[in-house]
Regions:
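A short core secondary-structure module
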Residues: 198, 202-252
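A structural signal for short hydrophobic beta-strand segments in well-ordered beta-sheet cores
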Residues: 190-192
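Short Gly/Pro-enriched turn/cap motifs at secondary-structure boundaries
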Residues: 180-183, 207-210, 225-227, 261-268
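Long, acidic (Asp/Glu-rich), low-complexity accessory segments flanking structured domains
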Residues: 275-294
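A short, Trp-centered hydrophobic/proline-enriched beta-strand micro-motif
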Residues: 168-176, 220
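Alpha-helical interface subdomain recognition
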Residues: 1-130, 135, 152-153, 164-168, ...
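Flexible, small-/acidic-enriched active-site or ligand-binding loops
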Residues: 244-276
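N-terminal glycine-rich flavin-associated loop
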Residues: 136-156, 182-185, 198
């Protein structure tokens, strides 16, 4: 996005004869009234005074935002320490989030949740991720698990699992990806064979977030090897004992190893191995085999909206850090925010973040209205992820050499931002979804 400097053709000294090939009166009028250096300077000054623009939230969502903004702010400094030490987020912090209702935010009240919409999910995810992406991502696994069970579970499964997920008693994790299966889930090979009243699972999974601490795995497996592609896949609600630091994977038939990562720490990433791992047959999601991919697809819209919100939070964190540093850092007798190349970056970061935030809200409102929103969700995720990376890169540039030092939180925000273009649907997949839907619409 705004990683490149903005230069208009006339600023390069091109003659009007050249400009005339692509300019007309309407375009010239827009340029004349559009963004210029004084506008960028004024916007940066407004930001420095704490004015970030109206977000359009109603009173309830403003209260939700303020609550989680305070919570994230209280843990921001500690979070950088967790990142540097590659520590798990403390369990007492997770319990505090549970007490605030994060894990049951969108679960219906009839199943023990708060019954709020995806717009509330966006607000909470953004504010927590603004403090630390790990905090904003703790709710992702609960959101995915609850969405799977709500959309595809039996009434007994809903009654058994949803209230426990909502309270944080149960910490779920999504177990989908395999070493040779990223976006192409149709080639998934982990097998689940029915033996009496159990399924025995054999295979390998990778990039599983928070796996050691999880109590419940939404486990995508192949139950029918004779059916090609997606048709033979099923989703299991696989229980396991919660691991400890000394024994992260105590379950029989299951092993795991940590994957060292640049950023997105706090929950840790794991490779998992299954060798006859037993799952109660009653925990087949929906009670019908072969529905796994359909179940999973039903979660894509919500998951991508929530990831877009996390990206907006990371981008806002980058802006906070970049602006704060630009105000504090003195060069040539004045704060570096006074220099055009700096306030220009800050102004464009703010404008782009607002754009991503509003697209995220629009997708959430579309979802809350019960309408199809894979196009909007894909757009929100694609745009917000790119803006988060751009904002982090620009904020590092504002910090200069200090931005490359690990003691400065912007170094963490940079590596956290990078994953957003990769997970929950890579940027290339999002672009393909968007293009396909646009072609369908004609």
């Amino acid at each position: 996005m705004s990683q490149s400097e903005i230069i208009r053709p006339q600023s390069l000294g091109l003659p009007r004869s050249v400009l005339a090939t692509f300019l007309n009166e309407d375009v010239e009028a827009v340029i004349a009234a559009g963004t210029r250096d004084p506008h960028r300077r004024a916007l940066a000054q407004h930001l420095a005074q704490g004015h970030g623009g109206a977000d359009g939230l109603d009173e309830t969502l403003q209260m939700v935002r303020d609550t989680f903004r305070r919570f994230a702010g209280e843990h921001r400094e500690a979070a950088h320490g967790w990142h540097l030490a590659d520590d798990l987020i403390p369990l007492d912090v997770i319990q505090n989030l549970a007490d605030l209702g994060v894990f049951g935010l969108t679960i219906p009240e009839s199943h023990g949740g708060a019954g709020m919409g995806k717009a509330a999910m966006c607000v909470v995810s953004e504010e927590l991720s603004r403090g630390y992406i790990g905090l904003g991502s703790l709710g992702t696994r609960s959101e995915i698990a609850a969405e799977l069970i709500l959309n595809g579970g039996t009434e007994a499964q809903k009654a058994h699992w949803l209230p426990r997920i909502a309270t944080g008693e149960i910490l779920p994790t999504a177990v989908f990806t395999e070493p040779n299966t990223g976006s192409d889930l149709g080639s998934l090979s982990t097998r689940a064979v029915r033996r009496g009243d159990q399924y025995l699972v054999t295979g390998n999974k990778t990039w599983i977030t928070h796996a050691a601490r999880a109590d419940l795995m939404t486990l995508l497996v192949r139950t029918n090897p004779d059916q090609p592609g997606y048709k033979g896949l099923s989703m299991l609600l696989a229980e396991k004992p919660r691991g400890t630091e000394g024994d992260p994977f105590p379950a029989t038939g299951m092993t795991g190893g940590e994957i060292a990562v640049l950023g997105y720490r706090g929950m840790k990433e794991y490779e998992l191995g299954f060798d006859g791992f037993a799952v109660d047959a009653n925990n087949l999601l929906g009670g019908i085999e072969g529905m796994g991919f359909k179940h999973l697809m039903a979660t894509f819209e919500s998951a991508r909206i929530q990831t877009a919100a996390r990206a907006v939070g990371v981008a806002q964190s980058a802006l906070d850090l970049g602006l704060g540093y630009a105000l504090d850092r003195q060069q040539f007798g004045q704060p570096i925010l006074a220099f055009p190349r700096i306030y220009g970056k800050v102004a464009m970061m703010a404008a782009e973040i607002m754009m991503a935030r509003q697209l995220c809200y629009a997708a959430a409102h579309q979802k809350d209205s019960g309408k199809r929103c894979d196009l909007e969700a894909g757009m929100a995720k694609l745009l917000a992820a790119r803006i988060a990376w751009s904002a982090a890169d620009n904020a590092v540039q504002i910090h200069g050499g200090n931005g490359y030092a690990m003691e400065y939180p912007i170094s963490r925000v940079l590596v956290d931002a990078r994953i957003l273009n990769v997970f929950e649907g890579a940027a290339e997949i999002q672009a393909n979804v968007i293009a396909t839907r646009l072609l369908e619409q004609g």
